[in-house]
């Protein structure tokens, strides 16, 4: 295990690991314990009582955070004709079809999110092995396979984030930057928590939201009392 830096060790002393803080207190602590010299990302992590191995307990989707993430997302849209024009008008950085498929196959990845119209998925599907492992493959569940490219691009630019449960039942989602006002980080945090509660599978047994933590990019995790996220 990598040795923690002196600043991290000092910052970690401010966090009582046996305690679960309110969402507001946790956000305040994340700012106090941030050791990065840049505007670090604040990430929320949730441990859910689901079995991701079962198809009816896989949780995946997207939500527009009320205050965005603080990151400018570069959008690539696979579309033709009028839909391509709509994507360009909505502000997508890259719009095209076969030309971009060729570029990606050659190792081009200067984008953060991919949107595709349904009629393009036959071609885009060829990129599954390349885009899939990077979490970039368009998917109807996250609203990135759609004919409404204007809405898709607008939501991404407004701060839409995708979430997906991993094999251990965890979900990690960025909720902003340390430079954000506390109240905005808390509201983003509560928005994703509410979204996950609504996404609870009917087959999930026992405690659903087991725990939640929040941390900055290079800071220690702060445990949150999930009842304060309601």
Swiss-Prot record:
An MF annotation (GO) of this entry: tRNA binding
Keywords recorded for this protein, A-Z: Repressor, Ribonucleoprotein, Ribosomal protein, RNA-binding, rRNA-binding, Translation regulation, tRNA-binding
Keyword RNA-binding: yes
CC terms in the record's Gene Ontology section: large ribosomal subunit
Keyword match tRNA-binding: yes
GO BP term, pick one: regulation of translation
Short name of one Pfam family: Ribosomal_L1
Disulfide bonds: none
NCBIfam families: rplA_bact (TIGR01169)
Function per UniProt: Binds directly to 23S rRNA. The L1 stalk is quite mobile in the ribosome, and is involved in E site tRNA release. Protein L1 is also a translational repressor protein, it controls the translation of the L11 operon by binding to its mRNA.
HAMAP family (UniProt xref): Ribosomal_uL1_B
Subunit architecture: Part of the 50S ribosomal subunit.
Family under the similarity heading: Belongs to the universal ribosomal protein uL1 family.
Protein name in UniProt: Large ribosomal subunit protein uL1
Organism, as annotated: Bacillus mycoides (strain KBAB4) (Bacillus weihenstephanensis)
Gene for this chain: rplA
């Amino acid at each position: 295990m990598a040795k923690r830096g002196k600043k991290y060790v000092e910052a970690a002393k401010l966090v009582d690991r046996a305690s679960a803080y309110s969402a507001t207190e946790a956000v305040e602590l994340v700012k106090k314990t941030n050791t990065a010299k840049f505007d670090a990302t604040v990430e929320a992590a949730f441990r859910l009582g689901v079995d991701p191995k079962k198809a009816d307990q896989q949780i995946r989707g997207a939500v527009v955070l009320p205050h965005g993430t603080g990151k400018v997302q570069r959008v690539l849209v696979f579309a033709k004709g009028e839909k391509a024009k709509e994507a360009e008008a909505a502000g997508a950085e890259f719009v095209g079809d076969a030309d971009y498929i060729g570029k990606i196959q050659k190792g081009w990845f200067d984008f953060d999110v991919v949107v595709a119209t349904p009629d393009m998925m036959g071609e885009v599907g060829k990129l599954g092995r390349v885009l899939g492992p990077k979490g970039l493959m368009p998917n109807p569940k996250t609203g990135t396979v759609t004919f409404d490219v204007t809405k898709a691009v607008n939501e991404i630019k407004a701060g839409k984030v995708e979430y997906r449960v991993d094999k251990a039942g965890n979900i990690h989602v960025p909720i902003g930057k340390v430079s954000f006002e506390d109240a905005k980080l808390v509201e983003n945090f509560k928005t994703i928590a509410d979204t996950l509660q609504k996404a609870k599978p009917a087959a999930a047994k026992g405690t659903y939201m087991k725990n939640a933590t929040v941390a900055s990019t290079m800071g220690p995790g702060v445990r949150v009392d999930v009842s304060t996220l309601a």
